[in-house]
Amino acid sequence: MKAISVPLKLINLQDDGFHLLMEVVVFKEKHLAVLDTGASRSVFDKSLIEQHLAETLKVSDEINAATLFTTTTTIQATIPLLKIGTLKIRDYETVAFDLQSVSDTYQQFGHPPIIGIIGGDILIQYSAVIDYKKLRLRLYKQK
């Protein structure tokens, strides 16, 4: 099984820890997302999803672990094509909520904005391996 190699960018958040960023393609546009091994599932910014999928959204109020156990309005949507490196994930079922404050924080520290968090659902499904020395994410597509 051949590995899909995705470059990572390591950023320092004011000596308070490091985050990994990666490029993703959503709605045929390149964006940056945070690679978060502690996130149970991948999420995308609500405004991005609303901009492209307004007519097909499902809205719900639920307790969401991704927002530190607070009640928030989440949006469920299907992204027609999510690309991570050469990996193409079609009809990706996602949850979206407001990531603007997260993106704003990155920008305040001189980093680019982010539109999503790539979490455990994708990382487990594609047997992800993070190589910190080479700053690469390897994903393995199941046959």
Residue ranges and their predicted role:
Residues 1-143:
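Pepsin/retropepsin-fold aspartyl endopeptidases
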